[in-house]
Swiss-Prot record:
Pfam families: MarR. This is Uncharacterized HTH-type transcriptional regulator BC_1936. Keywords: DNA-binding, Transcription, Transcription regulation. The keyword Translocase does not apply.
Length: 147
């Protein structure tokens, strides 16, 4: 680890935290018959509906191919409806999808929050949020170094 920079150590820690929290969230959401990715997709649809598949793909951490398969499954389960409006196909939640999200949402938000509430006070959480927001915004503009 001597060759690592503090930046590379932070990056590794973030990756490990993300993987661990996703595994635990997937296990937690099984009680609602959802995965973390499905939960995120349903939440984004509810927040921005109606929206196109392209708009949805920009908001979630699923690949374009993965989002197609997931939407097909969510549609078969009756959670979403895809509607063709002239040239555009939009996605919205059904009543069943809304109900599934409402069952899972309070408990999943509490579970997600517990990762931080258990070890950080409110001021530390605010600082972490501000720092992560700053890093995230920078990463959205980041370009690859020249070869």
């Amino acid at each position: 680890m001597r060759d690592n920079t503090i930046g590379s150590l932070i990056w590794l820690r973030l990756i490990r935290f993300t993987n661990q929290s996703n595994q635990l969230s997937n296990e937690f959401l099984k009680r609602f018959d959802l995965t973390t990715a499905q939960f995120d997709v349903l939440l984004q649809i509810r927040t921005y509906q109606p929206l196109t598949q392209m708009e949805l793909a920009e908001k979630v951490t699923v690949t374009q191919g993965g989002i197609s398969r997931m939407l097909t499954r969510l549609e078969k389960e009756g959670y979403i409806v895809r509607k063709q409006d002239w040239k555009t196909k939009t996605i919205s939640l059904t009543e069943q999808g809304e109900a599934a999200l409402e069952r899972a949402l309070p408990e999943q938000l509490a579970f997600q929050s517990s990762f931080f509430d258990d070890v950080l006070n409110e001021e530390e959480q605010k600082i972490l949020y501000e720092l992560m927001t700053k890093v995230h915004k920078h990463s959205e503009k980041k370009e690859l170094p020249q070869e």
